[in-house]
Amino acid sequence: MKFAVVGTGVIGSGWITRMLAHGHEVIATDPSEGAYERMLTQVKQNWPYAEQMGLAENASIQNLTFTPHLEEAVKDADHIQENVPEVEEIKDAVLKEIDFYAKPEATIGSSTSGIMPSELQANLSHPERLVVAHPFHPVYILPLVEIVPGKQTSEETTVKAEQIYESIGMDVLHVRHEIEGHIADRLMEALWRESLHIVNDGIATTEEVDKAFTHAAGLRYAQYGPFMTFHLAGGEGGMRHMLKQFGPALKKPWTKLIAPELTDDLYHKVVSGSEASSQGYTMSELDQKRNEFLIKVKELAEQYWPSDSKAMKKSNGAELQ
C-alpha cells in the first residue's frame, strides 16, 4: 500500500515512522521551508524506537520520498493522512486540494484532535471518503487511533479505513457520534482543567499534582481505564457495589471542569513549576526517557491485558445498538 502524508511536523513524522516500520511506501509533502530536513531528522530519531517494537521484513527509511508539491504526493496514494495545523481555514483549503488531486478510490484521514469530520467534509467534492483518524503522540509508539466518520462518510470508507490503520499496528477505536475533542482528548482535558484549578487555588504545585497522578491513578491507568479501575474498587461486588456505596459522592463538588482564567500568575506557576520538574533535562532527553518508558509499559500492559482492536469494536458494539 502506498501512503501519502500531508504535513510533516511531529504528528506527521510520527505517522511516517509507523507506516515505514510496517513495510509501506510513503511519500510526504510539506511546503514549509526546511520541512524535508526536519522530517528526515525526526524520522531517524524515531526509528530506533520502531526497531525496538519490531519492524516488518521489508521496512526501511529508504521507502520514504518527499516532495514540496501536494499534487505529486497524493495523486497515486491509496491512503492520505492530513496533519496540517489545527486551524479550520487551513485544513479546509488543504483537504479540498487533496480531494481534487487524489485518485477516486483513495481514502483520506485527518489527524485533527478536535474538529468534527462533518465540518471538514462540508466543502469537499467527495466527502464520503474522509474520516477523522486521530492518533496520539508519539504516534510510532502509542497504538490508539480514533476513527470518526462524518455525516457524509460512507460505510465502505469507514470499514476500509479501519482495516488500513490496523495494517500499521493501530488499535482502532470507532467513535459512534462525532463530538468536539472526540473521546480521549475530552477525558484528558477534564483532568488538565482540574489540575489547573488545583494549582491556581494554591492547593498544590505542578510537581505535586503530577506526583498525585503518576504515583497512584497513572500507574493503574496504564493497565485499566476508569471503568475497570472503579470496578476493581468495588471489591467482590465490583461496579455494582461501588456505585451503590460511592454513587452519592458524584453529587459532591469534587470537580470544577470549567477551565480557570489563564492569568499571568497562573501562567507563571505552571511554566516555572513544569520547568523545575524537568530537573535540567533538555526536551530531547525528556522525549527519549518518555519513549523508552512507554515501550516498556506497553509491553508490560500487553502481558496482563492484551489489546485487541477487534475485541474492542465487538465489545463497544454489544453495549450500544
UniProtKB/Swiss-Prot annotation:
Keywords carried by this UniProt record: Cytoplasm, NAD, Oxidoreductase
Major enzyme class: oxidoreductase
Any one GO biological process: carnitine metabolic process
Binding-site residues for NAD(+), renumbered to this chain: 7-12
Alphabetized GO MF terms: carnitine 3-dehydrogenase activity; NAD+ binding
UniProt keyword Secreted, yes or no: no
Pathways involved: Amine and polyamine metabolism; carnitine metabolism
Enzyme nomenclature, EC number: 1.1.1.108
Record-linked HAMAP family: L_carnitine_dehydrog (MF_02129)
Subunit structure: Homodimer.
Family membership: Belongs to the 3-hydroxyacyl-CoA dehydrogenase family. L-carnitine dehydrogenase subfamily.
Protein name listed in UniProt: L-carnitine dehydrogenase
Record lineage: Bacteria, Bacillati, Bacillota, Bacilli, Bacillales
